Amino acid sequence: MKYMGLNDIRESYLSFFEKKEHLRLPSFSLIPKNDKSLLLINAGMAPLKPYFTGLQTPPKTRVTTCQKCIRTGDIENIGKTSRHGTFFEMLGNFSFGDYFKEEVISWAWEYITEVLKFPKDRIYITIYLDDDEAFKIWTEKAGVDPSRIFRFGKEDNFWEHGSGPCGPCSEMHFDRREKPDLIKTREKFIELQDKDEVIEFWNLVFTQFDKDEDGNYNKLKNPNIDTGMGLERIATIMQNTDSIFEIDTIREVLDAVCKICNVKYGENHKNDVSLRIITDHIRSVTFMISDGILPSNEGRGYVLRRLLRRAARHGKTLGIEKTFLCGLCDVVIKNSKGAYKELEEKQDYIKNVIEIEEKRFDETLDSGMEILKNYIDELSLENKKVMSGEKAFRLYDTYGFPVELTQEILEEKGIEIDMNDFHSEMEKQKNRARDAREESNYMGKEIKLIDKLPESVTTKFVGYNSTSTDSKVEVLIKDDEFVSTINEGESGIVVTEETPFYAEMGGQIGDKGIIFGKNGEAKVVDCKNNISGKIIHIVQVVKGSIEKNENVTLEVNYKKRKDICKNHTATHMLQAALKKVVGSHINQSGSYVDNERLRFDFTHFTALTDEEILKVEAMVNDEIMAAYDVKTDIMSVDEAKKTGAMALFDEKYGNRVRVVSVGDFSRELCGGTHVNNSGEIGLFKIISESGVAAGIRRIEAITGKEAVRYTEENDNLIRNIEQELKCSKKDILNKINQYHSELKEKEKEINILKGKLASGFEENILSSVKEVSGVKYVASEVKGISGDTLRELCDKVRNKIDDGMVLLASKDGEKVQFVAMASKNAVKKGVHCGKVIKEVASMCGGNGGGRPDMAQAGGKDGEKLETALKEVGNIMEKLVK
């Protein structure tokens, strides 16, 4: 067994199974497609579920992949051990009703012993208790010594999760001991497994049963094979190391971290944990961003933010003061670009996203850490070991601290978070709630009836050239059951042999319209694809009934379709204009097209200037006025790329693609509907440009009559402003600037008067100074001033009383503003403005806090202000030492 690099192992595995007539598929995106049960792809078979369930037809019955995966279930332990990571690659070979146990076992043995040349006396096999068939193949076909095969129960060697496809599995294990002797008993085998001296490296799943709701195991007509071998795990064996962080490609990343922070790996346990966390997380972060995931406060974007900020925080603990993670991703990309070409194609984009997020975290880290330190000090003073969830949520919501990061920091101090309280706060902000999980079985989410349409059902789209056609009803579904009739007043699903209705896809909404037959009429409220691409019409029967097998006429709402076409073609032209005006780095990140407007999300890191927006808009309108023919051509993907056609990075295209061209101005791969000539769009108007995430901008625009209406409304608004300001259009800005100048002068005069008013309060306030245990304090209401003036007055009074605390309050209707300040000596004696003001504000229905020497707060119930101010003395007595 010779040393083998990680990249070489990957290639040898995939090449081996290509020779066994497997189709090598590229890794699927980390973002699951049509599977809400998963946040991120976490297993090699996960993207292949539709093939295993029969919902989609695989491109070949034999497939092999190396799938990028992410698991974050035990993220808090990542770095503490040297064996686990959040990012990993899973090698797999799969059969969809083709070969079964004999072939997969024989090939697994051949690859391990003849290609990788594992010593046979270090290999052990586990099988399911009564899987005699697998035992026979291992011993008779592969020639494995029966004493090296152990049988285990369902917990270890049977793959199932709820109902659905399942089956026994067989695992291959490697004995890592320096001088291995034959393991003779199951007990000894388990003992060595627990010590990680015997490790599992390949799992062969024989999916031969379908478990029903009653728990019965029914034999599948066409059994499948699902295998998984962790690339990093097999690399540790081939490179004779116990740690994934010692593997060639990963060690190179770790060494780069060491170089940045000038720390040597292996000399200090705490430093080693931080080094491993950064090394692991930058790999996950790089691949996630490459697949289109961006930092956010929900879903997979939250996972990314959590990983990125955890890595950045551990960089600080190693003494790294500058942003550094974007540089590390260069090392990740260098080592992985051979297998994942998209990494190099998007390298600048990935680095920009990382740098922006790291800088944002850097900006809030110091203030957030200061707040957290205050919380920890408060808990220490009160001798408490549990921090409220409300405080943890504030750090999360205001300072971008993932709660797990706060937990990690607090754990070092022996403090916990009240997570029930935290989740309660999270629930209050539903717009930031995590993605809800759906109940799922082994193959993912519960399969809906629309995804179980018989293979004989075909739906042909004929809507590129027509908005009306006659066809036959193939399937009717109502209340998730196949039916023969849908009656007036009922809703359901209609599937026909042919349809002119475009099904929602690629950002374009589904068509609306009507379906009518001899006995009734149905309104089509939406049109979608099921998981296998069959077109389904979601309908409401408004007259009579629609029956299965009857001939019907399908008519798309022509006006809505035409407006959708205008907006879709305009979206293509917008992207082309953005690339020309802003830069070639612009790529589509998302889009939405309906009959009223269009929305286009694209990769860019700063807001567009007014000049850029005007240039883009003018360019699109120039091309509209040029009245180019819009052409569509069908060609191979390679041919399309040679023409310069734009495509989405994460989209999987078939062998033949549809290319839509607007003259020579725009050329894109697209399956949507478009105008025949750019002149049909009429007018294009950008109505907004904004940021939606780090590195993602959004343009919203309108076309045709909507754009004309919008322009007319703006003209009317300008006319009204002219009348109000009594000036012409060209003088509006001058008039507004004049009013601004006058307003500023008035504000200056008001502030001078407020200052004089505040000075008049000083004497009254100073006359009411009291004392607690040698510390002076004053709590007073002042009328008619607020904001900066109130703070300035508080500061003056504090300086006048020399050694003490001042709390001032001002009412505006029922609202109350509080400011408190204390001298250094008063703080040393126990005064804490943040604690004082928090209690006082809470009595007035408000909240707030701050530092020991300065704090601010607000209240909602002004009637209770007098009572609250009287309590300041009692609060001071509790604090002063």
Curated annotation (Swiss-Prot):
It catalyses: tRNA(Ala) + L-alanine + ATP = L-alanyl-tRNA(Ala) + AMP + diphosphate. Keywords: Aminoacyl-tRNA synthetase, ATP-binding, Cytoplasm, Ligase, Metal-binding, Nucleotide-binding, Protein biosynthesis, RNA-binding, tRNA-binding, Zinc. It is found in: Cytoplasm. Zn(2+) binds at residues 568, 572, 670, 674. It is an enzyme of class 6 (ligase). One of its GO terms (biological process) is alanyl-tRNA aminoacylation. One of its GO terms (molecular function) is tRNA binding. SMART domains: tRNA_SAD (SM00863). Its EC number is 6.1.1.7. Binds 1 zinc ion per subunit. Belongs to the class-II aminoacyl-tRNA synthetase family. Consists of three domains; the N-terminal catalytic domain, the editing domain and the C-terminal C-Ala domain. The editing domain removes incorrectly charged amino acids, while the C-Ala domain, along with tRNA(Ala), serves as a bridge to cooperatively bring together the editing and aminoacylation centers thus stimulating deacylation of misacylated tRNAs. Catalyzes the attachment of alanine to tRNA(Ala) in a two-step reaction: alanine is first activated by ATP to form Ala-AMP and then transferred to the acceptor end of tRNA(Ala). Also edits incorrectly charged Ser-tRNA(Ala) and Gly-tRNA(Ala) via its editing domain. This is Alanine--tRNA ligase. It comes from Clostridium acetobutylicum (strain ATCC 824 / DSM 792 / JCM 1419 / IAM 19013 / LMG 5710 / NBRC 13948 / NRRL B-527 / VKM B-1787 / 2291 / W).
